[in-house]
From Swiss-Prot:
Record HAMAP family: MTTase_RimO
Enzyme superclass (EC): transferase
Gene Ontology cellular component annotations, sorted alphabetically: cytosol
Protein name: Ribosomal protein uS12 methylthiotransferase RimO
Residues the record lists as binding [4Fe-4S] cluster 2: 157, 161, 164
Record's cofactor remark: Binds 2 [4Fe-4S] clusters. One cluster is coordinated with 3 cysteines and an exchangeable S-adenosyl-L-methionine.
Residue span, MTTase N-terminal domain: 16-126
Binding sites annotated in the UniProt record for [4Fe-4S] cluster 1: 25, 61, 90
EC number: 2.8.4.4
Key words of the record: 4Fe-4S, Cytoplasm, Iron, Iron-sulfur, Metal-binding, S-adenosyl-L-methionine, Transferase
Keyword Cytoplasm tagged: yes
Annotated ranges, domain Radical SAM core: 143-380
C-alpha cells in the first residue's frame, strides 16, 4: 500500500509544509496517520509535491527485499526533488543500510517512533508558535477515503515464524487498552466512517500480553480480549472487518457474532501453507486437516462467511509432493479470497538457514498453478452469487456507474462490485445490489 498525504484547505503563508509518503501495510498507514495528526495539530500544512515542502517524511517498509527496494527508491525520489528528508518505519530499524545509500538524510528512525519523527521535523523546520487544533478533525488525519478507516489494536508480535522479521523490527505484542480502541472507533464512526478495518500484526492475540486487562468504556469495564473487543465494536453501527487473524482456537468464538450480523462475516486469516512439514519449517500451526474441520463448522454457523488467506509457494525445501498437498487443500477448503506469494528471502529471517532454495522458475510455475486452481474455486463461488441481493459499500461513483465492495471484499486486496444505478450514489453509501454477472474476482449488478 502506498499513500501520499493530501494538502489541507488552510493557506497560512508562514506555516511550514510537510510532504509525506507512506509505504507498506495498513498498520504502517495507521502509523503515518498518527504522525500527521500530531504535526497538523502543531500547525504544519501538507504538500502534495516534494518540491513544495520544507521537509519530506518517508514511512518505509522493510518486510521483503522488494519492499526495501521500493522504500529506497521513494527516499531517492524525495532526495532528488527536495533534499531534506526524514525516514521512519520498518526499514528504519536498519539505519546503516539506508545511510549507506543516502548519507545526507536529516534523520532515520525505526517503526512506532512517533516522538522521534516529530522531534526530527521540529529540528528541520520548527512549528508555528500557536497550535492550530481547529485544523484537526476529531478522528485525526486519515489517509484513507472518508468512509473507511484502519483501526490498529496492538503493536508487535509474539510469534516467531521463520520467514518473518517483524518481531525484530516492531518488538513483541503490546495491546492497546480496549477503552482507548473503542473511543477511537467511536470518534471515527461519528465522523462518518462506515467501515472499520481492524488491524495489527496478530489480531487474535489481542490482550494476551496484558492478561486481558480491563479498562473503562462508557459506564463499564471492558476486557482487552479478542471476542470482547469484536463484540463491542459491533455495537457502534459500522461495518467491522477483522484482518490478520492467527488461527488460535478462540477464533471460533467470533463466528456467532458474524452470524448475528454484529460484525462482518469476513475473516482474514493468513495460513501460509497446508503441508504439515512445510508449516513445521515455517513454525506455523501444522494441522490443516483440523483447520478444514473448523472451516466446515464455521460455515455451518455462518453460511455467508468469507475467508481470505494468503499462501507462500517455494518455501525452502518445498517438494513437489508438499506443493501438491497445498493444491489439494485449497481445492477442498474452497476459500473465497486467496493471495499467493513466491517465497522471497528476507535478511535476518531464520528461514535463510534452512537451505534447499527452490529455483525461481519452479516458484513461478507453482504460483501460476496455485492461482489457476484457486481461480476455478473463486469462479464457482462467485457465480453462486448471481441473482442474489448483496449489501455493497460504494468506493467510487461516476455519472454512469459506481464501484464498491460487498461484505466479502476488503479494500485494495479483494474484488469489487461494479454497480449500475438509476439514482445518484456517493462514496460511503451502502446500497442493495442485485448481482447479474460474475467473474473470478469481481461482481456486476444493478442497485435496487
Amino acid at each position: 500500500m502506498t499513500a501520499t498525504a493530501s494538502p489541507s484547505d488552510t493557506k497560512g503563508a508562514a506555516a511550514p509544509r510537510i510532504s509525506f509518503v507512506s509505504l507498506g501495510c495498513p498498520k504502517a498507514l495507521v502509523d503515518s496517520e498518527r504522525i500527521l495528526t500530531h504535526l497538523r495539530a502543531e500547525g504544519y500544512e501538507l504538500s502534495r509535491r516534494h518540491d513544495g515542502a520544507d521537509v519530506v517524511i518517508v514511512n518505509t517498509c522493510g518486510f521483503l527485499d522488494s519492499a526495501k527496494a521500493e522504500s529506497l527508491a521513494a527516499i531517492g525520489e524525495a532526495m532528488a526533488e527536495n533534499g531534506r528528508v526524514i525516514v521512519t518505519g520498518c526499514m528504519g530499524a536498519q539505519p546503516e543500510e539506508i545511510r549507506e545509500k543516502y548519507p545526507n538524510l536529516l534523520a532515520v528512525t525505526g517503526p512506532q517512533a512517533y516522538e522521534s519523527v516529530v522531534a526530527a521535523v521540529h529540528e528541520a523546520v520548527p512549528p508555528a508558535h500557536d497550535p492550530f487544533l481547529d485544523l484537526i478533525p476529531p478522528q485525526g488525519v486519515k489517509l484513507t477515503p472518508r468512509h473507511y478507516a484502519y483501526l490498529k489494536i496492538s503493536e508487535g508480535c509474539n510469534n516467531r515464524c521463520t520467514f518473518c522479521i517483524i518481531p525484530s523490527l516492531r518488538g513483541d505484542l503490546v495491546s492497546r487498552p480496549a477503552g482507548d480502541v473503542l473511543r477511537e472507533a467511536e470518534k471515527l464512526v461519528k465522523a462518518g466512517v462506515k467501515e472499520l478495518l481492524v488491524v495489527s500484526q496478530d489480531t487474535s492475540a489481542y490482550g494476551i500480553d496484558t492478561r486481558y486487562a480491563t479498562s473503562p468504556w462508557q459506564d463499564r469495564e471492558v476486557r482487552a480480549r479478542f471476542y470482547d473487543l469484536a463484540s463491542e465494536l459491533g455495537e457502534l453501527g459500522a461495518w467491522v472487518r477483522l484482518h490478520y487473524v492467527y488461527p488460535y482456537p478462540h477464533v471460533d468464538e467470533v463466528i456467532p457474532l458474524m452470524a448475528e450480523g454484529k460484525i462482518l462475516p469476513y475473516l482474514d486469516m493468513p495460513l501460509q501453507h497446508a503441508s504439515p512439514s512445510v508449516l513445521k519449517r515455517m513454525r506455523r500451526p501444522g494441522n490443516q486437516e483440523k483447520q478444514l474441520d473448523r472451516i466446515r463448522r464455521w460455515r455451518e454457523i455462518c453460511p455467508d462467511l468469507a475467508i481470505r488467506s494468503t499462501f507462500i509457494v517455494g518455501f525452502p525445501g518445498e517438494t513437489d509432493a508438499e506443493f501438491e498437498e497445498l493444491l489439494d487443500w485449497i481445492r477442498e477448503a474452497r476459500l473465497e479470497r486467496v493471495g499467493c506469494f513466491e517465497y522471497e528471502p528476507v535478511r535476518g529471517a531464520t528461514a535463510n538457514d534452512l537451505g534447499l532454495l527452490v529455483p525461481p522458475e519452479v516458484k513461478a510455475e507453482r504460483k501460476r498453478r496455485f492461482m489457476e486452481a484457486q481461480s476455478h474455486v473463486s469462479l464457482r463461488l462467485q457465480r453462486a452469487k448471481v441473482g442474489k441481493r448483496l449489501s455493497v459499500i460504494i468506493d467510487e461513483a461516476g455519472p454512469t456507474g459506481a464501484r464498491g465492495r460487498s461484505k466479502a471484499d476488503a479494500p485494495e486486496i479483494d474484488g469489487s462490485v461494479h454497480v449500475t444505478s438509476r439514482r445518484p450514489v456517493r462514496p460511503g453509501d451502502i446500497v442493495t445490489v442485485k448481482i447479474e454477472r460474475a467473474d473470478a474476482y469481481d461482481l456486476h449488478g444493478i442497485a435496487v
